[in-house]
Amino acid sequence: MTTATRISRARADRLRPHLEALASAPPAGPDPIDYVHRYTAVPDREVAALIASSLAFGRVAAFSGTLDQIFVLADAGGGPAAWAASALTQDDPGLQPLFYRWVRGPDLQRWVRTIARFMEKHGGLSVFMKRAVSPRDKDISQGLAQLVDALRSLALDPGEHEFQSLPRGFRHLLPHPKSGSACKRLCMLARWMTRSSAPDLGLWPVSPHQLVIPLDTHIHKVARLLGLTRRTDGSWRTAVEITRNLRRIDAEDPIRYDFALAHLGISGACKGRRIASICEPCALRPVCKVGGIG
């Protein structure tokens, strides 16, 4: 069993300026939150965020093609919120031929119906999360679990009784924190909606210190290089461990470096091994296990 990693205060102090330098650099490349920034009304942003975050797996260039087509339909339907609401009476046939990997058109239609039912019943994500998350909660995991439970229950059509009986493609859109999965896309949604600093939106009445880092292969690789974890599994426990160590760097906003760290990997600017032409200009080189002296 891997011993839990807890960085020292001195290590936190050493990491902080280099993470700040990385975070201050202009963002590299597109990001799924760009779809949410197309809209100004809160209901539109909430619906757009649910859709964009849920399909943000794999390469950005791959899933963005499907998202582009979905948001063309949404805009033609009066914007994401109005378009989703129309699914309460009729699915958009334009979704039928769309797909991304194992998520098929009927899964997307069910997802939009589910979102519409949620918005109608709960009045929006912000209203729901205000009830689901207490200031006393150590992190947002219980609130996210309640959100997933609510969405899963609303995904069932008449005659359906078990979420696990639904198609694999749809089930992939709604992972559960209690399953042990890192729930990267769910944590990314929470980051978008909670933090108020760019590029995030600050719509949820949740404290940033309760967020858990959206753990994917890029974040995991860089976190190991920085000594934020020794764990090799991309699990919820690993995400929590990395977040706890980031809290030693910034107790109030531990995942403020997530956007920059993720794009370090997404852009190809970190290969996980020393390549002088890549490592030398990197802001993290002095504190990286392979790029510098660690």
Report each predicted region and the residues it spans.
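HhH-family (HhH-GPD) DNA N-glycosylase catalytic core used in base-excision repair
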Residues: M1-G294
